[in-house]
Amino acid sequence: MTNFSPREIVSELDRYIIGQKDAKRAVAIALRNRWRRQQLSDELRDEVMPKNILMIGPTGVGKTEISRRLAKLAGAPFVKVEATKFTEVGYVGRDVEQIVRDLVEVGITLVREKKRAEVKAKAHQNAEERVLDALVGTTASPATRDSFRKKLRANELDEKEIEIDIAETGAPGGFEIPGMPGANIGVLNLSEMFGKALGGRTRKVKTTVKDSYELLVNDESDKLLDNEQIQREAMAAAENDGIVFLDEIDKIAARDGGIGAGVSREGVQRDLLPLVEGTTVATKYGPMKTDHILFIASGAFHVSKPSDLLPELQGRLPIRVELRALTKEDFRRILTETEASLIRQYKALLETEGVALDFTEDAIDALAEVAVQLNANVENIGARRLQTVMERVLDDISFNAPDRGGDTLMIDADYVRKHVGDLAANTDLSRYIL
């Protein structure tokens, strides 16, 4: 779990997302509260519940991007799900408890990678011995092994082809029984059982010495790991530090009428209630409590309103944050100030062909202006509009780049307007460029 301060979390998010100070502060405080809770005594820790967040704002202003960046910062099990993918229990589709099972799987992967890093030195040592076995055999004299070991460490044998045995890591056995959610619960994993009895299945792999190390280090790491301990730690991490980002929650808000799809939508909300409030979900690693999982919900709420959500669900999302629509200045900053800005991306892409791009200040102004106009006249899709505009402006250059290696191309305001200005000015035509 990360121990960044709220200020550090916000400044990290500032590198990738322009504006939206309130939303950044809310998620930063929520993330820091996870760490604060871990410092409490056991009896008080159980009483402190996460304050779930509802982010409201038009599309393309940074709601999903905040969640993506938060996932990398959190250092905790994190899943992002679209609320529209789930259906009420009894309908065809995924049920909401799958969210928790996915969270546990993410936890398992996180803990396994952490444990692998801890035993990497020992695993690398064992992998080297196995490479030597493949090169000179197990019966070679110590002198021969030492001579090959020196060559191996000097990278003289990197291209030599060897055959190694790798543990079989096939898909887990078992199957789901209809009507019994929980994936593999109560189903004997026969392949695992027989695998242990017979010492595990292996497969032969032909590879070079250089490429064999990654396979062998992973194989040796897994031998040194205790799977039961990994599962216990992953379950604890998912229960106490897990974060679930529920995107598009406005799409399951039942609108007036309550007929047709609206009924199923309300059913999904009712299924979400116990999950957000705190319940126990059966997973294939054992029961998992959801009391301390942090839920961050987000939606554009173009058609529906937050008040269209079930009152009980609204009550379980106590922190409301509104994200504002983007202005021309925001678009300018998105193009130039973010860590991996669009202009930087396109410059890097075309540099691979030997073409240097140079954007003037008035070109950046023009790009922002066109994006604002299109959003106002056609459909407001926020920062995503910039991708449409950039693609349109650089269409000819991208197409002809292989023939223009070594050129330096200047993009100015006139060039931008020539390629998109006329379309942006005409609402009817601009509809056809997204």
From Swiss-Prot:
The molecular function GO annotations come to: ATP binding; ATP hydrolysis activity; peptidase activity; proteasome-activating activity
* Subcellular localization: Cytoplasm
- Keywords annotated in UniProt: ATP-binding, Chaperone, Cytoplasm, Nucleotide-binding
Q: Which GO terms describe its biological process?
A: protein unfolding; proteolysis involved in protein catabolic process
The record's annotation in SUPFAM superfamilies points to: P-loop containing nucleoside triphosphate hydrolases (SSF52540)
Q: SMART domains given for it?
A: AAA, ClpB_D2-small
The cross-references to InterPro entries, in alphabetical order and at most eight, read: AAA+_ATPase, ATP-dep_Clp_protease_ClpX, ATPase_AAA_core, Clp_ATPase_C, HslU, P-loop_NTPase
Q: Which NCBIfam families match?
A: hslU, PRK05201.1
Assembly behavior: A double ring-shaped homohexamer of HslV is capped on each side by a ring-shaped HslU homohexamer. The assembly of the HslU/HslV complex is dependent on binding of ATP.
What HAMAP family is this protein classified in? HslU (MF_00249)
> So what does this one do?
ATPase subunit of a proteasome-like degradation complex; this subunit has chaperone activity. The binding of ATP and its subsequent hydrolysis by HslU are essential for unfolding of protein substrates subsequently hydrolyzed by HslV. HslU recognizes the N-terminal part of its protein substrates and unfolds these before they are guided to HslV for hydrolysis.
UniProt family annotation: Belongs to the ClpX chaperone family. HslU subfamily.
Q: What is this protein called?
A: ATP-dependent protease ATPase subunit HslU
Specify the species: Sinorhizobium fredii (strain NBRC 101917 / NGR234)
Q: What is the lineage of its organism?
A: Bacteria, Pseudomonadati, Pseudomonadota, Alphaproteobacteria, Hyphomicrobiales
